[in-house]
C-alpha cells in the first residue's frame, strides 16, 4: 500500500505505522490458543543463559546517568517462558530498592489488573523500557530510551512472547513509534516484527496513570479483555 498506510474501515485501527506487517481486525485474542511463527524451541538453560548475558551487558553499561544515580538494576520479574510479556516505563523508588519491576503501588494495581483476567506474575513476564530508575521518578528522556532500546528489543527476542502488552506512552512509543498516541492506540492489536520475531502487540494505560486518573480504569479493563 502507498506510504505504508493501512486504511481499514472505521471500526478498525487506522494509523501510519512503521515496520508493521499487518493490522488486525480488532477482536480479542484467545491467549490459550494463540500460535505463531516464533514458537520457542529454546531450552531452559539456553534461555536463562541468554537472559543472564543480557543482564550482564546492561549492568556493564558505561557513562549512564541513570545507572550512576540508581541503587539496583531492575531487569525483570515473572516467567520468561510465558506467552505474555509486559513492558512498563521504568523503575520507581520501590523497584530501585528491590531490583524488581512493578513492586510499588502501581505494581499492586497491576497485580489486580492481571487477576481480573485470571493471570498473575507466575504466568507473565515483566520488564521496562529502561532498567535503571530515572531521578525523581521522571519519564526517561528520548536519549535514555534510545540507549536502552537495543537491550529491550534483544530482551523481547530472547523471551519470544506471543503477546506483548505495552503499558503507557513511553513503552508504546519505544516499540511502535512516536507518531502514535496512547489514548488512540490503546486496546487495538498490531502485528509487529521486533528483531527476528513477530508478535501481537496491544497497549493500555500505565497503572501509575490509572492511580492519578481512576476514571480511566474502565478503559484499561476493556483493553485487558482483549487478551
Locate predicted features.
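A polyanion-binding, active-site-adjacent surface
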Residues: 2, 6, 10-227
Amino acid at each position: 500500500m502507498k506510504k505504508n498506510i493501512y486504511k481499514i474501515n472505521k471500526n478498525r485501527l487506522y494509523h501510519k505505522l512503521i515496520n508493521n506487517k499487518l493490522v488486525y481486525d480488532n477482536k480479542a485474542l484467545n491467549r490459550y490458543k494463540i500460535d505463531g511463527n516464533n514458537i520457542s524451541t529454546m531450552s531452559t538453560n539456553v534461555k536463562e543463559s541468554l537472559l543472564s548475558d543480557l543482564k550482564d551487558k546492561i549492568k556493564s553499561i558505561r557513562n549512564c546517568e541513570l545507572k550512576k544515580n540508581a541503587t539496583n538494576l531492575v531487569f525483570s520479574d515473572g516467567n520468561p517462558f510465558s506467552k505474555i510479556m509486559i513492558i512498563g516505563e521504568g523503575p520507581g523508588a520501590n523497584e530501585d530498592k528491590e531490583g524488581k519491576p512493578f513492586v510499588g503501588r502501581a505494581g499492586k494495581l497491576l497485580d489486580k489488573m492481571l487477576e481480573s483476567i485470571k493471570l498473575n506474575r507466575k504466568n507473565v513476564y515483566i520488564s521496562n523500557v529502561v532498567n535503571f530508575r530515572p531521578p525523581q521518578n521522571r519519564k526517561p528522556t528520548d536519549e535514555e530510551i534510545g540507549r536502552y532500546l537495543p537491550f529491550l528489543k534483544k530482551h523481547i527476542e530472547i523471551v519470544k512472547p506471543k503477546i506483548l502488552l505495552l503499558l503507557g506512552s513511553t513503552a508504546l512509543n519505544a516499540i511502535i513509534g512516536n507518531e502514535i498516541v496512547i489514548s488512540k492506540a490503546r486496546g487495538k492489536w498490531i502485528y509487529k516484527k521486533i528483531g527476528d520475531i513477530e508478535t501481537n502487540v496491544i497497549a493500555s494505560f500505565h497503572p501509575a496513570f490509572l492511580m492519578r486518573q481512576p476514571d480511566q480504569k474502565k478503559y484499561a479493563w476493556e483493553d485487558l479483555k482483549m487478551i
